[in-house]
Amino acid sequence: MSVAEPAPRRRRRRGWIIALAVLVVVLVVAVVVGESAARAYATGRIHDELATAFGLDADHPMDVDLGPGLLLAQAATGTIDSVDVAIDDVPLGDLTGTVDLEATGIPLDAERAVGTVRATATVDEKNVAKLGGYLSGVDLDSITLGDGTIDVAATVKALFLSVPVSAAIVPTAEDGQLVFTPRSVTVNGQVVDVADLTSGPLGSLASKFLGSQSFCVAQYLPSAVELDSVQVRRADLVLVFAGDDVVLGGPALSTKGTCPS
């Protein structure tokens, strides 16, 4: 009497299928664990480097986003696609703001340059008020943010009279500095041409009130990035910085910038 053996073959086939399924699960878990470990390491490294670059405490909170793609797959090519970092309460001299940093094409080789680096610092109206000494040569009654301008107001003494004056000041970026230039002036409710006011009989007083001054932002930031533009947007002063050929292993991230003397 013969005995058929199909059942053991099915069991062996089923065993191979189970083994392959287990192997796939193990590989997936390994990738997930490896990906998580890689992201944790990269996030910590980025945090530490930026804390040093911006002069922050070692435990200063940051939101680091390494993008949606597999970090391990990107690392295999030698370049990370993109990194976005948000940092609150970054000191910029007299100012404090929120910095949003964007970098693309970040090489794993620290001797190679990053593709692009762009940072945006957002400073609210309360902090802008700390720039009073750079906006005018007299004590100011108020500092507010207007339609693309920083609006200042003061009361000045002229011929034994107290005269209310105000000015709309336009901030611009120049050689790593915030430069403040008056666009319009109102004296006792009347709009006066800036040139006429400074060249008139009250010229010396007007010049003191309107004197264009500058605030060096570069000295508080890594020399790798430069102040590119500035604008007043709603209730914030927005500073945009950009960096070209930034080498992660070079001194440009550990040294501060400078402004013309």
Language-model regions, residue ranges each:
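Hydrophobic membrane-targeting and insertion signals
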Residues: 1-70, 74-76, 252-261
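N-terminal beta-strand/beta-hairpin edge segment
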Residues: 59-159, 166
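A structural signal for short hydrophobic beta-strand segments in well-ordered beta-sheet cores
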Residues: 143, 169-171, 229-230
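Hydrophobic residues embedded in beta-strands of well-ordered beta-sheets
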Residues: 150, 176-178, 237
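Secondary-structure transition/turn motif
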Residues: 155-158, 182-191, 240-250
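Short helix-loop boundary/capping segments
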Residues: 167-201
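Extracytoplasmic/luminal low-complexity segments enriched in Pro/Gly and acidic/polar residues
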Residues: 197-261
